[in-house]
Amino acid sequence: VETLLRRPILRIVPVGLMLIALQRTAFANAHPFGVRLQIVLALCAAAGVAGGAERGAWMGFVLGIMFDLGNGFPLGQHGLAYGLAGFVGGLVNAVAVDPHWWLKLIFVALGGAVGEFSVPVVQTFVSDGGWQGQRLGSILPVIAVSCAALSFLFTHLGRWCLAIRKKTWKPRNE
């Protein structure tokens, strides 16, 4: 039973439900510079930083499917975007084995921007929306900065959700 409770999916689903509820209620009226904040997207990118590209993409896809089911979007629309955000965030591990805090911050911001950019691209293919009326030049910087600001908290939360222990380095001579 204890090993079952340590499975990542049993951690991701409740945390994802809480963040989706927060995004739809508390952050629904928070529009800095006319842009709706995407806290679930920030968690997906931060989970990629904490767990690597593959785990970040997996967690982003799961949270994106949950977001689509809860908001009535076509199934997979945000799953693809959030999975891409987690993958891009996880690419930090290709640059450095144990990245500094500022490198993590940059990749969470980059993952959030790429994920937000991919939403209208996917909308073009799956629905009537898409590029019409999108102000991506003003949306992407706000999303990137908000994801970067949330990266300090969400990197640790993403590591916990993915059931990853912090790396410990031991000398080889012991």
Positions of PLM-derived features:
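Terminal, non-globular segments
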Residues: V1-E174
